[in-house]
Amino acid sequence: MIYLDHSATTKPYKEVCDTVCRALREDFWNPASMYRPAAAVAGKMKTAFASLASDLGCEPSELIQTSCATEASNMALKGLFSRYGTRLNTIIATEADHDATLSTLNYLEQHGARIILLKPLKNGLIDPDDLEHVLDERTLCVSLLWVNNETGVVQDLETLCKVIRRKAPECFIHADMVQAWGKIDFSLQDLDVDLASFSAHKIHGPKGTGLLYKRKKVIPDVLIHGGGQQNGWRSGTENWPLLAGMAKASAMQKESFARRKERVRV
C-alpha cells in the first residue's frame, strides 16, 4: 500500500520511536516526584518545552501538553466559556470546521452559548465581510480552522484576525493549527491569535499527545484538577516519553520543511 493521507496521520520517524522508547525505559520516573532522577526528568521536560516553543515561536510557559488537539480545543473553548460566558456568550466558527470544534460548540450551545456557524464561500474561504457582520460586543471567541483537514483550504488568518480585533476587541481568537504545523512557515509571536491547538501525530510524532498554545494574558478556566502539574493548567502525571517524541518530531519536521521549501524554489 502506498500511503499518502498525511492529513489523517503520519508514520512516526524512526528517531521519534527511538526517543520515546528510550524515555520509557530509562526515564520512567514521575517528573513531579522529589528525588533526584525524577528532578532530572523534570529538567528534560523543560528542555523539550523550550525546543517546541522555539519551533513554534512562543514562550515555553505558553505551551500546555495535552493528549491530542481535540483536548486542546476543548480546553480552549470550554475554558473560555466557563470563565467569561455570563458576559460574553457568542462563539463563532464555520460549518466546515473539524468535529473537535463543532462537537464542542454543540455541547456549549446546550449549556447556554450562542453559536454562529458561518458558511464558507465556494472556494472554501471565510468572507471577511460575513465575519464582520456577525461580530458584536458579546462575542467571546472566534475559532478558525487555518488549514482545512479535508479540502486543504488555507484561510487568510491575518486578514480575519484584523477584522476581529477591529470589530470585537474583547473577543478571543482560537486557531486549529493541526494541519498547518510542518506545512506552513509561521511563528506564533507574529500571529494575532490567543489560543491554538496542535497534534503531534500529524508531524511524524507519536499519537496520544498534542499542545495547547495559550498566550500569557489569556486565562480560561481549568478543566482538569488534581496535583497541579503544568503550572496548574492540566493536572495529572506528565507524559514525558510522548513529550520527548513530540519535541523530536517537531525538530525533524522543521528541518524537513526547510529542505522541501528549498527544493521547490530550485
Predicted regions and their residues:
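Pyridoxal 5′-phosphate
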Residues: M1-V266
